[in-house]
Amino acid sequence: MFKKRTLRSIFVSLMLTALCCLTLVGCSSKSSDELPKLVIGCDNCRPYNYTDEDGKPAGMDVDLAKEACRRMGYEPVFEQIEWNRRDVLLASGKIDCLWSCFSMDGQEDRYAWVGPYMYSRQIVAVLYDSPIRHLSDLEGKSVAVRVGSKAETTFLEHSEEGVPQVQNVYCLSDLSEVITALRNDYVDACAGYAAAVREQLRNAGVEYRFLNEDFARAKLGIAFSKGSDEELRNKLSDALDEMLADGTTARILQAYGVNTDKVLGGEENE
């Protein structure tokens, strides 16, 4: 009798333990599934944002967004978009924000911004054997830029001192198209963020030179639509401030070979 009762007690205890474990796992899974999502619109702008060999989002902006969302209790969802449709997608609510090496300069009143979280140097690149040596040599030439970029604004609106009047400005949907235009001699030069242009040119196997003069410096931020959730923006801003203060932002950027003393202090590394 004692033996049967003992075996029954052990069996009941095991069943209760298993039930508790299943309950805990279920709660944990449910909690993870119920995390609010932050849908981030981005495009191919390596090393800031790109798709790796496994088809997963990667890059400096991706890593920063993942860590910021972890601290906020959000799940980041990265959506590769056509950059020239960014405002339509933002207004429709299909994406919550734009986070992809996006310049705040000249667009301060167009979006509700979080940032700047980083700074970037704007450069002009030419093929290695190009006769173009200085910014002034671009007068009457053709330049390719990424649509929506600081470079686009600069060359279309002549918003920076020392940038000459060029003959044509080709605004292309992503940086890979910009580099292709330069490589195939469709344009005389291309312009954009130094780190991104350098990375794309190297990956494309293009022999290139940067002109000695930088034509601008850009503040990079995360763009939300006007009238969007202010509490969400404040949470993101607080998370980024914490990451900067505790050195997390610097560690993420250093993993990509970035000189953080310059990009976090107002300039980009050479």
Locate predicted features:
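Extended ligand-binding regions for polar small-molecule ligands
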Residues: 28, 59-71, 132, 136-150, ...
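Short glycine-rich His-centered loop
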Residues: 35-59
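Periplasmic-binding protein-like
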Residues: 43-44, 119-126, 202-241, 259-270
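Ligand-binding cleft/hinge of the Venus flytrap
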Residues: 50-53, 65-74, 151-172, 200-206, ...
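Short helix-initiation/N-cap motifs at beta->coil->alpha
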Residues: 62, 77-88, 169-184, 218
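Acidic, polar ligand-binding/catalytic clefts
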Residues: 66, 70, 75-137, 209-214
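A conserved helix-loop-strand patch within extracytoplasmic ligand-binding domains
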Residues: 74, 82, 115-165, 169, ...
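A ligand-binding cleft/hinge motif common to bilobed small-molecule-binding domains
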Residues: 85-88, 101-110, 154-157, 181-216
